[in-house]
C-alpha cells in the first residue's frame, strides 16, 4: 500500500487545513523522511504490512505530476494507492473512504486523476469543517486549525489509522461500512 497525503510544501502551509494529508502522514511517522525529486517518502508497518507514505512536493494543484514517479519508485499499481486529502464539504470529525470517484472540486485530486487517466483511485477525504459565511474559500483552506479543532483532528487521525488497518486486512468495502458513518467529537 502507498498512502499519498496531499498538501503544500514549506513552512507557510505546514499546519493549514489544506495540508491535512501531509499532517496525517506526519501523525503516522514524523521523522526520517527521505526526498526524491517530486516527493518525500517514508515507510511504516501497519497490521503486519509495510506501507509507504508519500508527500508530493509539487504543490497541491500539481500533485498529479508526482504520481507516475511514485508508481515507478515503489513498483506500485493504481490499486496500491490511497490518496488522503481535505474536503471542505465534510464536517470536521468526519471522513469518507471511497474506491473511486470524481475530484469533487479538489484541484489536487483533479491533477492526480488527469495524470493517471482514471477516477478509479482509492481515497480518504478528511472533513476540515464548515467555511464561515462570507469567508473566502482560499483563506479558509489556507487557515490553521484552532486548538479545539486540533483535539478533534488528532482523534480523526487515530480513526484513519484504524481504517487503513481495516483496508489492509479486510478490504476497503469493510472500512467504508465501518468508518463512513462515524463522527469524531471532543
Curated annotation (Swiss-Prot):
Its main location: cytoplasm. One of its GO terms (biological process) is rescue of stalled ribosome. The active site is at 18 (proton acceptor). InterPro entries: Pept_tRNA_hydro, Pept_tRNA_hydro_CS, Pept_tRNA_hydro_sf. GO terms for cellular component: cytoplasm. It is found in: Cytoplasm. Hydrolyzes ribosome-free peptidyl-tRNAs (with 1 or more amino acids incorporated), which drop off the ribosome during protein synthesis, or as a result of ribosome stalling. Belongs to the PTH family. This is Peptidyl-tRNA hydrolase. The gene is pth.
